[in-house]
Each structure stands twice: as C-alpha cells, then as structure tokens.
C-alpha cells in the first residue's frame, strides 16, 4: 500500500467555476466523480472585481453545486491553494439531488461574511459565456506556477482572476 492509499479521501461540495469539469480536471489533474447536490443555508454571491463567486451563510439560501468525491489530500491542497486565504474550509451537510440523501462534506466558504464586495447572485451560465475562457487560462497559469514558482508570488496569479470588464475594478 502506498501512503496515498492510507490517507482518507475527501468529498468536497463545489459551486461556481468549480462546477465546470474543464476547470476541475485542470486543477486536480484528473476527472473526479461529480455528483449533483444542494447546500441549504448559504447564498452564492458575486464578488466585485472577481471572476469567481463566494458563499456565505444565509438563512434562506440554497446553492446548487457538485460534490467532488474521493479527493486526495494533495488534491484538496490544490483547491485550497487556488482559492487562497480569503476562503476557509468547513464541513457542511448537503442533500444529493438524485436521491435526497444527506451527506457531510467539506466546502470552501468566504472568510469575511460581512465583506462589502459580496453582492447579488452569481450566475454559472453567464460565467461560462463571459468568463470561463479567461478563468481556465488563469487556472493553467496557476498550475504552472504551483509546479515551478520561479520566484513569482501568488499575487501574480491573482491578477489573472480579476474581472477587468467591470467598472468596479477600474
């Protein structure tokens, strides 16, 4: 048995850009099993000047997303790295869309629940149309950086996930 066989696997609820298989496959360097699920008690917000959303607790919130099943510690670390320090990982209960079974999983929540940059509702289809190509380019650059930082900082990567089309980022 290898050391990776001994590590527990992780099931992670993802939303936003991580629902897109092309993004997940690039970041995790594989195609994990994805299961549709809903997270109650959270809202999916837009973030001013960003290509990606965040979630934060909300009494009446409901988020449709996916569970990435069986992730390794290394894959979970890749998700954490690309999200950065503005997010925190939490254990939440989701409901599987097909079976209505409840399941405890991990997800990534925006650390500052009072952030004034959170607004409205993030739209996956709009993101795919307007921003997916740029986000995949940014994720590719992130993976290159992760493999060989070459003196570059994480902040250089973060510039790629800024939404330069919005007036708020000007």
Curated annotation (Swiss-Prot):
Residues 147-170 are annotated as: Disordered. The keyword Acyltransferase applies. Ubiquitous. Residues 147-162 have a biased composition (Basic and acidic residues). Keywords: Acyltransferase, Transferase. Induction: Up-regulated early after infection with P.syringae carrying avrRpt2. Expressed constitutively. Its EC number is 2.3.2.-. This is Protein AIG2 A. It comes from Arabidopsis thaliana. The lineage of its organism: Eukaryota, Viridiplantae, Streptophyta, Embryophyta, Tracheophyta. The gene is AIG2A.
């Amino acid at each position: 048995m290898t050391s990776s066989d001994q590590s527990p696997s992780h099931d992670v609820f993802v939303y936003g850009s991580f629902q897109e298989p092309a993004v997940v496959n690039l970041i995790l360097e594989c195609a994990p099993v994805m299961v549709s699920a809903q997270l109650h008690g959270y809202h999916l917000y837009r973030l001013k000047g960003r290509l990606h959303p965040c979630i934060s607790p909300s009494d009446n919130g409901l988020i449709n997303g996916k569970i990435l099943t069986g992730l390794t510690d290394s894959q979970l670390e890749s998700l954490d790295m690309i999200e950065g320090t503005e997010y925190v990982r939490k254990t939440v209960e989701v409901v599987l869309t097909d079976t209505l079974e409840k399941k405890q999983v991990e997800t990534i929540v925006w650390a500052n629940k009072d952030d004034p940059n959170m607004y409205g509702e993030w739209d996956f289809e709009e993101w795919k149309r307007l921003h997916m190509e740029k986000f995949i380019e940014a994720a590719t650059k992130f993976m290159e950086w992760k493999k060989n930082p070459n003196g570059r900082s994480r902040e250089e990567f973060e510039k790629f996930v800024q939404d330069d089309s919005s007036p708020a980022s000007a």
